[in-house]
Amino acid sequence: MPCYHKLKAWQLCSGEVVFAERGAIARELELPCGQCIGCRLKRSLSWTIRNVHESQVHPLSMFVTLTYGDDGYNPSLVYRDFQLFMKRLRRSVGPCRFFAVGEYGESDELNRYVRTFSGLDTTSRRPHFHALIYGQYFSDRAQIGSVDGKPLWRSPRLEALWKHGHSSFGDVTFQSAAYCSRYCCDKVNGERALDHYKRVDVATGELVDVVPEMAHMSLRPAIGVPWLARYGADIVCARDGVVLNGKTYALPRFYDRVVESLVPDLHSDKEFDRYILSEKFAADLTPERMAAREIVAKARISTLQRKL
């Protein structure tokens, strides 16, 4: 996905990048804004690819959903609750890696889900966590339903570990990884965030601030690095991209940085090849075409329903 609102910048002879013309300028740059729908979708896709690759190096993995019940209900996400859940999980089943996001239910999709499988009466944008857990799986599972044809399970062991409400789990797939990664598209920044992250506390009637959507993950090593160490050199040399679900995607930017640090000459060659290839698509990068593509991207993302 391209950036639809690139920022003009300048690189000084010292190597510093500035956003106002000053000093000894070496060259002019166009940098991604990081906030438009194109940048958010690109970041989301990168996390999806890295999480799918992470799952491929573990024999066991699961997609866990943790919601809050009505007892002691807090309208805001509390990351400490998830941290303690992970500590209990590791004490119970052993080492594991994870990629977790905390977010708030969109429209009534989460509310319908919670009412269906837990019986809770929900009327607000309920905070919840999704986590891709690598290296462990609950064998005491019992099916409680399905989402998009994929079975959804409950587990007494999982319920004992998450003490704040309803819990369930399914399999890690491209779709579930993408579902987690789309938190990038939900987070609101800037002036809009002041009103967006306010909720009414149903217990007191007060207007309270809630924390924004968040993501936390295993860092040592980073998500996707075990896969990259095993297959990365062959993939980069062969096609400069990755294939998932029969479709070829560009390498995540993080993979590029790792390859650059390990094999700088190979990275330089690939960068030059990409520059030459980009010349073929120059006609599709005019301001008019970019404006049209942004409209299409926003329309496409609006059709993606969140069902968990």
Describe these PLM feature segments.
Residues 42-123:
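Signature for HUH/AEP ssDNA processing cores
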Residues 31-34, 58-63, 95-96, 164, ...:
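Sequence-level motif detector for i,i+2 pairs with an aromatic at +2
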Residues 1-52, 274:
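DNA replication initiation on ssDNA origins
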Residues 37, 65, 99-102, 168-170, ...:
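Residues in well-ordered beta-strands of folded domains
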